[in-house]
Amino acid sequence: MGLLGSVVLGVSTVAPVYCLTATLGPTVTAVGVRMPAVFLAGFLPMLLVAFAYKELNKDFPDCGTSFTWTAKAFGPRVGWMAGWGLTVATIIVLSNLAGVATEFLYLMLGEMTGSGWVADLDRNTAVHLLTVVLLIAGATAMSYRGMTATKWFQYGLVGLQLAVLLLFAAIAVGKAAAGDLPDSIGFSFSWLDPLQVGSFSAFTAGLSLSIFMYWGWDTCLTMNEETLGSAKTPGRAAMISMVTLVGSYLLVAIAAQMFAGVGTTGTGLGNPETADNVFAALARPVLGSPWSILLFLAVVASAAASLQTTFIPVARTLLAMSAYRAVPPRFGAVHPRFRTPGYATVAAGSATAVFYVGMSLISENVVEDTILALGLMICSYYALTAFACVWYFRRSLRTSPRDLLLKGIAPLLGGLLLSGVFLQTLTDAWAPDYGSGAVLGVGSVFVIGVGILLLGALLMTCYGLVRPEFFRGETLRKETPALVMED
């Protein structure tokens, strides 16, 4: 896989159209018209952390990425928790992707057939859950066969997403500039100033959402052994993916805000009734009929593409953890024909389906709370990786100004920023009114987020008692050579 394929992989995993429809509304609710500023601010810590990934990958291109690098820098237990954070974050994202894909699939079919009955099928719990499970099974099967077999499929889906976003933004800006929309607002450069956000708490709430929007760009690094020029190409691909994402996010955020405004009624981006699915509300007003189908199709394509590629980081992380004896050996099984971590892929798919069905049957609000808690997982393992870079290269930081900046200062700042978001989110989530409810007076998002991290610590402790080799530092040390998947 070359540079283009790696970039497509990174963008595909992030699923820009899905991220935008899911986060435009909540971000406006948190910070109002400063939404573009928060998207830009969320890019900064991710860019700084990207330097850490790039330098670590150049020195040690291992498919375990965060798990391997953090273990080498800080020891096996910290590395194990970084791997756990990535694994759990992936399962939460995968389950939500399947849910959004199902919703838009029936909306698209309803729009195509002109049937409200078809569009409303998603409201039937049994139909919804069955469709979600089928989508997860299909994505698992495609990931099981490997990226090479579906390369052109991914190219097409990513190209469709970016083309529809450009079309949507152009038409939205054009209609807003015409001046005949009641809720439209004129562009102001103050929208790009994060210092004008009302409060630090509101800023971190919006920042947590924007960080989620960039999650997954590092997927191209987990396939570094299968990439041409594995020392440099994955790092370059990660950077190009990041720039592509921030450009498309800013363009669509500004266009949507100009067209719909930030009001709490009608098509306003702050309307609580449409906040979790903005494109469903804006598709027809912006694109008109029948072209609104394109936006529904783009969301389905975005979720479908990401469903397949998002299995890659978790499967390869589990493969690496198995190779270093941090998890049971069967997770390291590689399919003899497709050369993919088959057992880990199927296990991730099964866990995703069970998680989504279980959470949905408990309460729809619980699903939403797990998404809010996702920011804690993302910030934790990205920050650990950034700090790992600084510590790993600490003896070579004085070699040149470049090394000091890219291996030291930039990753350190990125790690500190993400740690700040983590701690502020943790503080806010403690409040009983944060999320859908409270448990013993503590916000449900705090309970879920901290509970998942504590569950990881418990599993790590139990496995360490059964198979202590990894935790004694016998299987993975700083001098251990990189794990390579042989063809």
Predicted features, each with a name:
Residues 35-36, 113-127, 155-293:
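Helix-loop-helix junctions that connect adjacent transmembrane segments
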Residues 19-127, 244, 444-457:
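Extracellular loop-to-transmembrane helix junctions
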Residues 68-70, 75, 107-112, 190-193, ...:
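TM-loop-TM module centered on a large, flexible mid-protein loop between adjacent transmembrane helices
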Residues 68-71, 99-127, 159, 164, ...:
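Helix-loop-helix connectors at the membrane interface of multi-pass transporters/channels
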Residues 1, 386-410, 428-487:
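Terminal cytosolic tails of multi-pass membrane transporters
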Residues 129-182, 238-242, 377-382, 392, ...:
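Membrane-interface loop-to-helix entry segments
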Residues 85-100, 214, 218-227, 289-329, ...:
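Membrane-helix boundary/coupling elements in multi-pass transport proteins
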Residues 1-24, 29-33, 47-51, 463-487:
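Membrane-interface "cap" regions at the ends of multi-pass membrane proteins
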